[in-house]
Amino acid sequence: LKTGMIVAERYEILGKIGTGGMADVYKAKDHKLNRFVAVKVLKPEFREDTTFIKKFRSEAQAAAVLTHPNIVNVFDVGDDNGVYYIVMELIEGITLKEYISKKGKLSVKEATSIAIQVSMGLEAAHSHGIVHRDVKPQNIIISMDGKVKVTDFGIARAASSNTISSN
């Protein structure tokens, strides 16, 4: 996607803020609600796999029911002429991976605080029957004010095969 593009007649792409194996993440302006959001867009090489697309959408919809201070909120999911996207809360901060790279070894107090916040987010997801399955430093965001949030619930389950449910 290019800066200035409008997705779903609503989200104006402002620039790329991250990339992963299956999707790119952009900062965008939601013109309907007048706020900044993160828009995760499925990479083109995955757009032809209908099974993957179904899982991507259903898991994103499942993650959207999660509302917790330690989970990145999902606001919307859809596709715009073959551009499959998930709209999420925009967290101004860095991933735990970036944080560790910059800071080096964490203190016991800091590591414990991060672990507790991640655990609280995962517990909230588990109470809704949602399993993350891809918890790693890249999927943990530390906001500018120190709040820790887990992200990538939808894509994590959609990306692995035969994972729709473990009831």
Task: Give the residues covered by each predicted segment.
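Activation segment signature within eukaryotic-like protein kinase domains
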Residues: 114-115
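Protein kinase glycine-rich loop
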Residues: 13-20, 25
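AlphaC helix of the eukaryotic protein kinase fold
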Residues: 43-65
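Protein kinase catalytic-loop region centered on the HRD/HxD motif
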Residues: 118-130
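Conserved N-lobe loop of protein kinases adjacent to the ATP-binding glycine-rich P-loop
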Residues: 29-36
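Activation-segment/catalytic-loop signature of the eukaryotic protein kinase fold
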Residues: 77
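Conserved short submotifs of the Hanks-type protein kinase catalytic core
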Residues: 81-95, 99
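Activation segment of protein kinases
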Residues: 50, 144-167
